[in-house]
C-alpha cells in the first residue's frame, strides 16, 4: 500500500523543514523527502545573518516579508527549544554597516527612511567596536539584524516536525511528481507516496521538478565561499559588514567571514582566489583577524531566480502543487515567513495579497526591494 500524507515537502534544507514544521504544528500529516542529509547543502554553508536591512535599502514588499520573518525568530527561539530541545543560538548585537568613503556614507544614508536604522559617527562606532579597522567614517547600526546558526535552526525545524508527527526521509531523491484524481503522486528512489499537496523546496535543484510540472522558470547557481577563524581574544560583539563581506561572531569563539558571489558556478568547493578576497576585505574591517588561526573554508550554492526574488506560491494551473524555492542570499532569513506562508496557503488561512502577487511564479516584474 502506498503511504498517504496530507503534504509532502520535497527538500530538506531550512526552507523545506520550516514548511514541514509549520504544517506539522497545525496537525497535518507531513513528510519531507531529502535527497541527501537534512540541511547539508546551502543551509550548512550560510553564515546565518538575519539581515533584512543588509539586503534592502528601502521599504517595499520584500522588506516587509523579510522583517516579518526576522521578527518570527524571536518567537521561534524559545518555541523550537521547547519542542526540539535544540538551541538555535540566536545572537543579539546587531550589524554595523560600515562606511569607509563618502560614497559609502551617501549610500548608507539612503536607509534613513527605515526607522530601525541608526546612523553612527566614527567615534560612536569605535566606542562599540574598538577593534574595528582604521578610516571608518561612520556606520548604520541595525540592532534587529541579529544572527542564528543555520544548521541548528534546520535541525530544530526537522526534529520539531518529527516530534509533532512528521516523517523525514533522508537519502530519498524525488524522481517525479504527477497529479491524479484527488491527489499528487510523488515517486522517489524508495517508492511512491501520495498526498493532497506537494511542495517543491529543493533550492537550486528545483529546476528539474519545475520543468516536470510545466513551469518555465530557471534557477541559477551563485556560489558563495566562506571561511571561519578562531578568535584569539579580540573583542567583537556585533556583525561587521562592508562591500558585500561580513564578519559574524559565533558563540563558539569562531568568526565567520563571507561570502563571495560567483554566478553560474556549480562547483561546491572553495577556491583560493575567493578565500583570498574574503581575507582582504575582512582585514580592512577587523585588522586583528590577520593573526587568527583558520578553522575551515567551505562553499555553497545559492539559488537565484531571474529577478533575484523567490518563487513562493501555488502552481497557476494545479492547486495541489506548491513551491518555495529561489531564496538566493536570504534562505535563513526568510525561512520562518516562508514556512508560515506555505502552511497558511495549504490550510486555507488568509495570506497577504501583496505577498502572493510578489512571489508567484507567473509574475512579470521584480519585487521592489
UniProtKB/Swiss-Prot annotation:
InterPro entries named among the record's database cross-references = FAD-dep_OxRdtase (IPR006076), FAD/NAD-bd_sf (IPR036188), Gly_oxidase_ThiO (IPR012727)
pH profile of the protein: Optimum pH is 8.5. Displays over 60% of maximum activity at pH 8.0-10.
| Assigned EC number | 1.4.3.19
- Describe its function: Catalyzes the FAD-dependent oxidative deamination of glycine, leading to glyoxylate, ammonia and hydrogen peroxide. Is also able to act on various amines and D-amino acids to yield the corresponding alpha-keto acids, ammonia/amine, and hydrogen peroxide. Can also oxidize the herbicide glyphosate (N-phosphonomethylglycine), and thus may be involved in the degradation pathway that allows B.licheniformis J33-8 to grow with glyphosate as the sole source of carbon.
Which parts of the sequence bind FAD? 14-15, 34-35, 42-43, 47-49, 174, 327-333
**Which SUPFAM superfamilies does its entry note?**
FAD-linked reductases, C-terminal domain (SSF54373), FAD/NAD(P)-binding domain (SSF51905)
- Kindly tell me the pathway this chain contributes to: Cofactor biosynthesis; thiamine diphosphate biosynthesis
Kindly state the subunit structure of this protein: Homotetramer.
Can you tell me where the transmembrane regions are? none
Gene3D superfamilies, per the entry: D-Amino Acid Oxidase, subunit A, domain 2 (3.30.9.10), FAD/NAD(P)-binding domain (3.50.50.60)
Native species:
Bacillus licheniformis
Q: What is this protein called?
A: Glycine oxidase
Q: Name one GO biological process term.
A: thiamine diphosphate biosynthetic process
GO MF term (any one):
flavin adenine dinucleotide binding
Keywords, in A-Z order: FAD, Flavoprotein, Oxidoreductase, Thiamine biosynthesis
Q: Name one GO cellular component term.
A: cytoplasm
Which annotated residues bind substrate? 302, 329
As for family, the record states: Belongs to the DAO family. ThiO subfamily.
- Cofactor details (free text): Binds 1 FAD per subunit.
Superkingdom classification of source: Bacteria
What is the biotechnology note for this entry, i.e. how is it used?
A: This glyphosate-degrading enzyme could be of potential use in agricultural biotechnology for the development of new-generation herbicide-resistant plants. The SCF-4 mutant obtained by engineering shows significant improved catalytic efficiency towards glyphosate, and a better affinity to glyphosate than that reported for glyphosate oxidoreductase GOX in a Monsanto's patent.
Thermoactivity: Optimum temperature is 40 degrees Celsius. Retains 60% of the maximum activity at 0 degrees Celsius, suggesting it is a cold-adapted enzyme.
Please write the reaction equations for the catalytic activity of this protein: glycine + O2 + H2O = glyoxylate + H2O2 + NH4(+); glyphosate + O2 + H2O = aminomethylphosphonate + glyoxylate + H2O2 + H(+); N-ethylglycine + O2 + H2O = ethylamine + glyoxylate + H2O2; sarcosine + O2 + H2O = methylamine + glyoxylate + H2O2
